[in-house]
Amino acid sequence: MKRNNFSAVNKVVQSSPVVKQPKRGLCSSLRQTHALSVLLDWGTLPHHVILQIFQYLPLIDRARASSVCRRWNEVFHIPDLWRKFEFELNQSATSYFKSTHPDLIQQIIKKHAAHLQYVSFKVDSSTESAEAACDILSQLVNCSIQTLGLISTAKPSFMNVPKSHFVSALTVVFVNSKSLSSIKIEDTPVDDPSLKILVANNSDTLRLLKMSSCPHVSSDGILCVADHCQGLRELALNYYILSDEILLALSSETHVNLEHLRIDVVSENPGQIKFHSIKKRSWDALIKHSPRVNVVMYFFLYEEEFEAFFKEETPVTHLYFGRSVSRAILGRIGLNCPRLIELVVCANGLLPLDSELIRIAKHCKNLTSLGLSECEVSCSAFVEFVRLCGRRLTQLSIMEEVLVPDDRYTPDEVHTEVSKHLGRVWFPDVMPIW
């Protein structure tokens, strides 16, 4: 192989016109050798080039690369590389992801706490991991965090931490970071006094607050946020906390337009929570103030718990039903949810949804996405639904078992008709058989 390469090079040299080269002295050769060695020395790369490379490397590879030379080690500690960091904490015997090494955690706290801006904690299901996250939070006193996220990968382990310990650690960040803009603290024991401290120190900068499933927070705590954080654009909370006063506060003249409101409607046991109704005038005030807001509602209720919902016009845009929902409720949605964009129904029972779907298609003119799982719809009603919606249906996910043959169409014929109305090829989803 080498012989072939050399012969190819020789041919090129021989075919080139002969140019008389000046004789090179010893100094010229040394200069050429030095220039070549400089080009091959990675340590001479400019800081900004190394920085660009490091930004694409995982932390462990970045740490290894930092030991190549002193210059690379200097770049390793440049503040820009430490703006964003995710602490991963787990018990090795029960978790599948690697934990951030304790030595690295201490190095970050000592050398880079002041550089941290986008921080998240990912913990497994163990209480020990959640407590370790709280210990780190309580040490972040010399930082100016902008975004904070607490993530439980399995069950909500932060809920097992003593409330006083969690609140104390979180308060350290709320007090010392004066520019918090995004906070995701769902499934945690945060409470109303903590939110008041957050508001006192970060009311001018807060833009996003996600705190679903926080049982120690009341409507008063959220109302305090809505009243004072005039720049808040995204909010996620549980329905039992939502009140007319909160919606009116979010609709005040001095408040910026709300962009995203997520509401989780959850019940573990029938009758555990008595759900209230939100007045139509409160919803109307929100839509008048923020006409483009996405109102997203996740329902995990039993059928008998839906009485308070959709009796009047509701400006919901995205609806997800995680448990069975009755035909009566779907009928209300068709009449009272004109802004609906997406509807996902996981289960309905054995009664077909023919008239309910057609009503939704006629009245919900913005609907672009539908998902049906454990439901029943006659093939002809489904085709009529798609015909009414037409090509605005950009997402259509229907399990094959949902479609019930009738005297007009079989499930095999449905895909042809539906594809024609959608303007693209469509097939129902099929449950894989393993």
Swiss-Prot record:
Tissues with expression: Expressed in the hypothalamus, especially in the suprachiasmatic nucleus (SCN). Expression is driven by the core-clock. There is a pronounced diurnal and circadian expression rhythms rising rapidly at the start of the day and declining at the onset of the night.
Span of domain F-box: 39-85
LRR repeats: 187-213, 214-239, 242-265, 322-347, 349-374, 375-400
Matches recorded under Pfam families: F-box-like
GO cellular component: cytosol; nucleus; SCF ubiquitin ligase complex
Disruption-associated phenotype: Mice show normal periodicity of wheel-running rhythms with compromised organization of daily activities: mice do not display significant difference from their wild-type littermates in both the free-running period in constant darkness (DD) and activity onset in 12 hours of light/12 hours of darkness (LD). However, an alteration in the daily activities is observed: while wild-type mice show 2 peaks of activity during the active period, the late night activity is eliminated in Fbxl21-deficient mice.
Origin: domain of life: Eukaryota
CDD domains in alphabetical order: F-box_FBXL21, FBXL21_LRR
Gene3D superfamilies membership: 1.20.1280.50, Ribonuclease Inhibitor (3.80.10.10)
UniProt KW Nucleus keyword: yes
Coiled coil regions in record: none
GO biological processes: entrainment of circadian clock by photoperiod; protein ubiquitination; rhythmic process
UniProt entry tagged with the keyword Amino-acid biosynthesis: no
Pathway: Protein modification; protein ubiquitination
Subcellular location: Cytoplasm, Cytosol; Nucleus
UniProt keyword terms in alphabetical order: Biological rhythms, Cytoplasm, Leucine-rich repeat, Nucleus, Repeat, Ubl conjugation pathway
Described function: Substrate-recognition component of the SCF(FBXL21) E3 ubiquitin ligase complex involved in circadian rhythm function. Plays a key role in the maintenance of both the speed and the robustness of the circadian clock oscillation. The SCF(FBXL21) complex mainly acts in the cytosol and mediates ubiquitination of CRY proteins (CRY1 and CRY2), leading to CRY proteins stabilization. The SCF(FBXL21) complex counteracts the activity of the SCF(FBXL3) complex and protects CRY proteins from degradation.
Assembly: Part of the SCF (SKP1-CUL1-F-box) E3 ubiquitin-protein ligase complex SCF(FBXL21) composed of CUL1, SKP1, RBX1 and FBXL21. Interacts with CRY1 and CRY2.
Name the record gives this protein: F-box/LRR-repeat protein 21
Source organism per UniProt: Mus musculus
